[in-house]
Amino acid sequence: MCMGSQGDCQPFIALALALQAKGARVRLYAPAEMEELCATFVAPLARPLIDFFGMPHLSVKKLLESDPVVRDAMSRGNFFKFMQGVSQPNYLDMTLSDADLVLSDLLNHFPADHIVYNTLFAAQGATAAEVLNVSSTLVSMQMTGSPSAFEPCLLISPKLFRKLPFFLRRATWHAFSLLMIYAPIFRDTKWRVKKLGLRPLSTSQKMDIWLGNAAGCSLIIARSPLLSPAPRDWPAAERKRVLGAFILSAQEQVKAWPPSVELRAFLDAADPPVYIGWGSMVAISPLHMLTLALRVLKSLGKRGVILAGWAKLSANLLDESIASDVEELRSYLAENVLIIESNAPHEWLFPQCAAIVHHGGAGTTASALRSGIPSVITPCFVDQPELAEKVNRLGVGIGLNQFHSVTVKQLASALSTVLTDQAMRSRAAILGEKLCAEDGAAIAASDILLRLNTINATSFDEQSVKRPGAARVGVQPAVGAA
């Protein structure tokens, strides 16, 4: 079960395919708007379709488009205001309506032997596992394990985090966890008690669910240990749970998202371009994002490929500009820049670029690092500043301050550095080779199935495997929402 943007859900497609390749039957529960993405990725490939169940009510994209509070919070990188925006009653109602549909499907049509869910659907995934009396796995794209004094908390900037004494560093993680368990995704008392007849979750139970410590649950961190090694103050067992990013290969992405004739021609026409893409982020305004990108490219005389993203960047936005250089930007765009409206196969595109400018989302960062091409990160909020700092520390790119404060001069300077610093480019290439040797989705799939088979070899099979309609565990296990 996965909730969120494409960046939150796409890794679960990779995991679903990896589980399917190992003989598991899989049903993916995700926002209905991801159905086309799922079908697009899988249909052209020589393998069975993923069994997809679309959750129709909650859409992060629609929430961003329709709610000015949420949109402004993202624009300014204000996490607290963002949480305030998504704490509205209608957000909770939509979440629980989708959760109810998922649970009904699990009970009546797909009696899974194991439930896998992401952090944005943690309470609902854990409840589904509780009702079905099966084991579960929490997959996190962030380092949301035990409180650590060595892993920057997502609540504050990494720079501020490292200035704090150790006990306060851990305290920020406790505060972050408390903030999350009082978010709408955990306010499900009405659903659990009135609809399902379960006891309400206590604070300690919510905390266990959030940290992946709930009964019968295991935690997987979908990050490369080369990028995010487990903090040394995590428990020994937890340090082994950083398994690698869940990535669809370049071949899979190209078959799913065939590069357009225009993109191929643009890449072949001259020197490698600079890629600029901010994914699902909308910062300040789409016009600001576009003019920032164009002014930086123009100042350096570089060609660029710009991803339209959720901000819907396009040349038409320049019609809204009253800036004195708007005609120069329009001309530069027409001659030197290609804006791609649809999703781009990052694993194929990034290695053909001279540099990569992006927002620091977990999936984009993983693909950028795997490409061996240095990047500039302009983070907005949540885990993006932390990933920007990690890229800085590895010396394979430059992480800037939050997007809303980045100037043309700052971004141009950073981009110039990653384009010309040969030592940095060499480090990026070496790291990229190492990361490409990893297969986090396959490792995670093996881990999940091994654990499921181990459970079935013990007393667990007497409790849950014998329920009516259960799949044969260990032969062809049914994994729900992987």
Residue positions per predicted region:
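Nucleotide-sugar-dependent glycosyltransferase catalytic domains
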Residues: A32-R303, A315-Y332, S426, I430-E433, ...
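Donor nucleotide-activated moiety binding/catalytic core segment of transferases
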Residues: V305, G309, A315-H359, G363-T364
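A donor-sugar binding/catalytic signature common to diverse glycosyltransferases
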Residues: D8, Y117, S342-E389
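N-terminal subdomain of nucleotide-sugar transferases
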Residues: M1-D51
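Conserved beta-strand positions in the Rossmann-like core of class I SAM-dependent methyltransferases
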Residues: R27, V305, V376
